[in-house]
Amino acid sequence: MESSADRLARAAALGREHEVRALLEAGASPNAPNTFGRTPIQVMMMGNVKVAALLLSYGADSNCEDPTTLSRPVHDAAREGFLDTLVVLHQAGARLDVRDAWGRLPLDLALERGHHDVVRYLRYLLSSAGNVSRVTDRHNFCSSTPRCLGLRGQPPKQR
């Protein structure tokens, strides 16, 4: 018989919001690892903001890291270009200044994949938090000023 952790992880991975809700309401833990050691938020369908918000509202850990790659859900969302999911994760307390096992920030992954809206959002937040110099030095940007980064004090564009 399949465990509730496996059922919840599978439902989250497939983006089945109603099934995720039913399992959570029935008492399934949003942080219980499945058979493969992954939590629902780690395997969820990244483009499904409703599933992400639902898991987070039931207490899913937005900062859980993969034990092998050290990547977190924000790394996955940034890499795949899911700005809406990234915003929900960040609003739930996900850190944006964490590196994976290869030393990459979520910003690095968004840059590599050309997800410009995600890059703007992350640069804006990191500059607001005073983390731009650390990020810009690593990428050899011209300077750490918002003007140089093209932010000019503007919030990220909304979809």
From Swiss-Prot:
<feature type="modified residue" description="Phosphoserine">
    <location>
        <position position="143"/>
    </location>
</feature>
<dbReference type="GO" id="GO:0043065">
    <property type="term" value="P:positive regulation of apoptotic process"/>
</dbReference>
<dbReference type="GO" id="GO:0033598">
    <property type="term" value="P:mammary gland epithelial cell proliferation"/>
</dbReference>
<dbReference type="GO" id="GO:0045786">
    <property type="term" value="P:negative regulation of cell cycle"/>
</dbReference>
<dbReference type="GO" id="GO:0045892">
    <property type="term" value="P:negative regulation of DNA-templated transcription"/>
</dbReference>
<dbReference type="GO" id="GO:0060057">
    <property type="term" value="P:apoptotic process involved in mammary gland involution"/>
</dbReference>
<dbReference type="GO" id="GO:1990948">
    <property type="term" value="F:ubiquitin ligase inhibitor activity"/>
</dbReference>
<dbReference type="GO" id="GO:0000122">
    <property type="term" value="P:negative regulation of transcription by RNA polymerase II"/>
</dbReference>
<dbReference type="GO" id="GO:0051059">
    <property type="term" value="F:NF-kappaB binding"/>
</dbReference>
<dbReference type="GO" id="GO:0009303">
    <property type="term" value="P:rRNA transcription"/>
</dbReference>
<dbReference type="GO" id="GO:0022008">
    <property type="term" value="P:neurogenesis"/>
</dbReference>
<feature type="repeat" description="ANK 1">
    <location>
        <begin position="3"/>
        <end position="35"/>
    </location>
</feature>
<dbReference type="GO" id="GO:0021549">
    <property type="term" value="P:cerebellum development"/>
</dbReference>
<dbReference type="GO" id="GO:0005634">
    <property type="term" value="C:nucleus"/>
</dbReference>
<keyword id="KW-0963">Cytoplasm</keyword>
<dbReference type="GO" id="GO:0071333">
    <property type="term" value="P:cellular response to glucose stimulus"/>
</dbReference>
<dbReference type="GO" id="GO:0033088">
    <property type="term" value="P:negative regulation of immature T cell proliferation in thymus"/>
</dbReference>
<dbReference type="GO" id="GO:0055105">
    <property type="term" value="F:ubiquitin-protein transferase inhibitor activity"/>
</dbReference>
<keyword id="KW-0040">ANK repeat</keyword>
<dbReference type="GO" id="GO:0019901">
    <property type="term" value="F:protein kinase binding"/>
</dbReference>
<keyword id="KW-0043">Tumor suppressor</keyword>
<dbReference type="GO" id="GO:0033235">
    <property type="term" value="P:positive regulation of protein sumoylation"/>
</dbReference>
<dbReference type="GO" id="GO:0008544">
    <property type="term" value="P:epidermis development"/>
</dbReference>
<dbReference type="GO" id="GO:0005730">
    <property type="term" value="C:nucleolus"/>
</dbReference>
<dbReference type="GO" id="GO:0097718">
    <property type="term" value="F:disordered domain specific binding"/>
</dbReference>
<dbReference type="GO" id="GO:0001953">
    <property type="term" value="P:negative regulation of cell-matrix adhesion"/>
</dbReference>
<dbReference type="GO" id="GO:0031648">
    <property type="term" value="P:protein destabilization"/>
</dbReference>
<dbReference type="InterPro" id="IPR050776">
    <property type="entry name" value="Ank_Repeat/CDKN_Inhibitor"/>
</dbReference>
<dbReference type="GO" id="GO:0019789">
    <property type="term" value="F:SUMO transferase activity"/>
</dbReference>
<dbReference type="GO" id="GO:1903051">
    <property type="term" value="P:negative regulation of proteolysis involved in protein catabolic process"/>
</dbReference>
<dbReference type="GO" id="GO:0033600">
    <property type="term" value="P:negative regulation of mammary gland epithelial cell proliferation"/>
</dbReference>
<dbReference type="GO" id="GO:1904750">
    <property type="term" value="P:negative regulation of protein localization to nucleolus"/>
</dbReference>
<dbReference type="GO" id="GO:0090399">
    <property type="term" value="P:replicative senescence"/>
</dbReference>
<feature type="repeat" description="ANK 2">
    <location>
        <begin position="36"/>
        <end position="64"/>
    </location>
</feature>
<dbReference type="GO" id="GO:0097190">
    <property type="term" value="P:apoptotic signaling pathway"/>
</dbReference>
<dbReference type="GO" id="GO:0090402">
    <property type="term" value="P:oncogene-induced cell senescence"/>
</dbReference>
<dbReference type="GO" id="GO:0070534">
    <property type="term" value="P:protein K63-linked ubiquitination"/>
</dbReference>
<dbReference type="GO" id="GO:0035019">
    <property type="term" value="P:somatic stem cell population maintenance"/>
</dbReference>
<dbReference type="GO" id="GO:0070301">
    <property type="term" value="P:cellular response to hydrogen peroxide"/>
</dbReference>
<protein>
    <recommendedName>
        <fullName>Cyclin-dependent kinase inhibitor 2A</fullName>
    </recommendedName>
</protein>
<dbReference type="GO" id="GO:0060058">
    <property type="term" value="P:positive regulation of apoptotic process involved in mammary gland involution"/>
</dbReference>
<dbReference type="GO" id="GO:0009651">
    <property type="term" value="P:response to salt stress"/>
</dbReference>
